[in-house]
Amino acid sequence: MFCAGQTDNKLPFNFQDGREFRVGDCALFRAVDVPPFIGFIRWIEKKEGYPKLRVSWLYRPADVKLNKGIQVNAAPNEIFYSFHQDETSAVSLLHPCKVAFLRKGVELPVGISSFVCWRVYDIDNKCLWWLTDQDYINVSSFILPVFIYYIHSYILLHI
């Protein structure tokens, strides 16, 4: 099993058709009658046939339900990281996708085609937090340390 934060997490899982996925990748996942789901691959457990994946889901604005029916004001390509995780079969993987995890106020450079994630969707409390807010760390401290390290490293190194 390969988990986010492990030293061997850069080892890819290769499909026979040439697709390649790693822990820490974002990908599109097959869905029925709706746009593909977007997920952050947290671990891959290799098994015979298709491996199992642990995925943290990223939500599109239309899927975010806030308190008191407040409407989400979001950029056209904005998505929201969440603490919602599931195990799923790799058979549902479509292909990798780009997600730029950015600090509040940082814009995606012109010419870059990507989803953008500035905020976290707290499903239980039905609210949004900025990725760099410290207030929500106690909400799901069992998930956040590796993710925050990964995201802050990405923000500092890639943007």
PLM regions: where:
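Epigenetic mark-reader domains in eukaryotic nuclear proteins
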Residues: 1-18, 47-149, 156-159
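Short beta-strand-centered aromatic/proline hotspots
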Residues: 34-47, 54
